Amino acid sequence: LASILGGDRSTVAYSLEDMARDTVGLLDALAIESAHLVGLSMGGMIAQCVAIHDAPRVRSLASIMSTTGSPRVGQAKPEVLAELLKPPPPDRDGYVDYGVGVWRLLASPGFPFDEAKTRELVGRSYDRSFDPKGVARQIAAIAAARDRTPALAEVRVPTVVIHGTDD
């Protein structure tokens, strides 16, 4: 991650574009010609990449709590970034506590935070597919991503961007 943050983007093992290609591969495997794509955070970045590189596969795009990759917009608050860069605990209970803490930082202060529901969802995520190295690869993919703003200006499908000032 340090080399990527230093500007060497060649070291990323699994890029957002790779994940976008995997998304299209899933559509192919399911025999889905095109789809409405909705992505949250990194999922929004992946959906943007699909819309850029495989436009005919995208009926509409919803990018939620995400960014274009531009260093001028959509940057995480320092306390959120610091928490996201910490290695997650490997045990389930520690990971659930960590995940609840991250989601609490991401939640808008103007709305109630449902800790019990968040704890349940983070636990289900851990049970389904926890891989600490995967988390690091995802953070590296985001850090290595280039600014998609110029390419996104060419996207011609109905698009909605949902973001808040207190996220």
Model features per residue range: what roles?
Residues 93-137:
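Conserved alpha/beta-hydrolase catalytic His-Asp/Glu region
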Residues 52, 59-90, 134:
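Flexible "cap/lid" loop of the alpha/beta hydrolase fold
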Residues 39-43, 47:
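Gly/Ala-rich beta-loop-alpha elbow adjacent to hydrolase catalytic centers
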Residues 1-38:
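Active-site loop/oxyanion-hole signature of alpha/beta-hydrolase fold enzymes
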Residues 155, 161-163:
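Short beta-strand/loop motif that positions the catalytic acidic residue
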Residues 85-88, 134-151, 157:
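Active-site nucleophile elbow and catalytic-triad environment of alpha/beta-hydrolase enzymes
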Residues 36, 59-62, 153:
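Residue in the alpha/beta-hydrolase core beta-strand immediately N-terminal to the catalytic nucleophile
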Residues 165-167:
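Acidic beta-to-alpha connecting loop that harbors the catalytic carboxylate
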